[in-house]
C-alpha cells in the first residue's frame, strides 16, 4: 500500500513538473517570436535591397505561374510550363550581373545541347537501329568526357561551369531518350520555349525594375574600405596616446574603439572573395553609366589587393596596443604631437582617395602635400632629440662600445655569502655580468686592471665549470628585463613609430593604383575651383 502511495506521489510530481515546463514554454513563446521578428527586421534594415529582391522574385513567380493559371497560355504551353517556374527559381539572383550570367549560361547550354542532340538523332535515324545505337553511345561517351574535362579549365570553371552542367544534362536526356521515344524532339522544343520564357522574365525583372549592379557594389566596397582604414588608424593612434581612467564609461568606450578598429581592418582583409565575385558578375553587366564606359573590374581587384597589404600594417599597428611590454606613458607623451599629426595626414590622404573614387574624379596632384613630409620630419627630429631613450645612457653606450671592441676589464670578488662574482671595473654599481658560482669552485684569478678578450673570459669560465654543478639564477621577470635593459622601454614605441612611417611608404602604391583606376574608368579631371567653392560653403 505504501509503495502505491509513493508511486502515485511521484506521478503527481512528474505531472506538475511537466505542466510547469509547458507553462514556461508558453511564456517564452512571445519572446522567441519577438526575437525572430527582430532578426527579420535587422536583415532588411542592413540592406533594404533584400526586400526589393524578395518582391521581385515574388512578382516573377506570379507572372510565370500565369502559364498554368490562364487557360490560353496553358493550352499553348501545356505541362512544360513547369520548366519556366524552375528556371525562375534557379536563375533569378540578387544582382543583375549574377542573373545575366546564370540566365545566359542556362539558355546557351540548353540551346546548344538541343541542337547537337537533334543532329545526332538525325544521323542515328539514317544509320539504322544498330548503328544508330552505337553512334548514340559513342557520342554520349565522347561529349560527356570532353565536357567534363573542359570544366576543369580555370576560365571555364569560373565563368561557364553552370552552362556546361546544363549542356551535359540536356544533351544526355534528349539524346538517350530519343532512341526509344519518337516525340522527344518535340518535347525538347517545347521545354526550350518555356525555359526561354523563364529566362526572359528573370532578365526583365532584374534589369528593368530596381536593378542591383554588382559594379556599383564593388565601387562602394572600395570606398568603404578606404574610409574604414582611415578611421581605424585614427582610433589606434588616439587609443595609444590617451590617458586611461578607471571608470565604467571609459571601459565601454574602449570596447567601442576596439570594435571600430577590428571592423575597420577586418572588412579589408576579408574582402578578397567578395571582391572577386562582384568583379566576375560585373563583367556580365551591360554598360549602364552615362558615358557607357567599360567597368574596370580587374583594376578594382588590384586596388583591393593593395589595400589588403596596407591593412596588414594597420593590424601590426593595432598589435602595438596589445603587447605585454608597453612604453610608459611619460615617454609616449613626448612623441604624441608628431605621431598624431603624421597619422592625421595619413588619414587625410585615405579620405581624399575615398572621395575621389566616390565622386568619380581624379585625385589632386598635391595629395602627398608638404604637410605630410613636414610631419615625417617633425617625428624624425623629435626622436633624434631623445637619443638616450633609444640608445641608452652614456654609461651603457660606453660599456657596449667596449664590448664590441673586445676590450673589457673585469675583477672578481668574494661576497659575504661565499659566492664569487665577476664585475666590470667601469661599472660603479657592481652589476653581475656572469653566472654566480658556488664557494668551492676554483677559478683562475684575473689580475686587477688586466685586459682580456671576451672569448678568453668565456674559455676560463668554461674550464672552471667543467664537471661542476652550477647554480643558475632565477628567471628574470618582465620587470627585471625592463630594468636590466635601459633602452627596452622605448622599443615598443619605436615599433609603433616605424609602422606609421611604413604606412607613408605604402601610400604611394595605393595612390598609384587609384590613379590607374581613374584613368581606366575615365574619371573626370580634378577641379580645384569646385573644392574651393565647397570649402567656402562649409565655412
Swiss-Prot record:
The keyword Transcription does not apply. One of its GO terms (biological process) is malate transport. It holds the Pfam family ALMT. It comes from the Eukaryota. It is found in: Membrane. Its main location: membrane. One of its GO terms (cellular component) is membrane. The chain crosses the membrane at residues 57-77, 80-100, 107-127, 130-150, 165-185, 192-212. Malate transporter. Belongs to the aromatic acid exporter (TC 2.A.85) family. This is Aluminum-activated malate transporter 13.
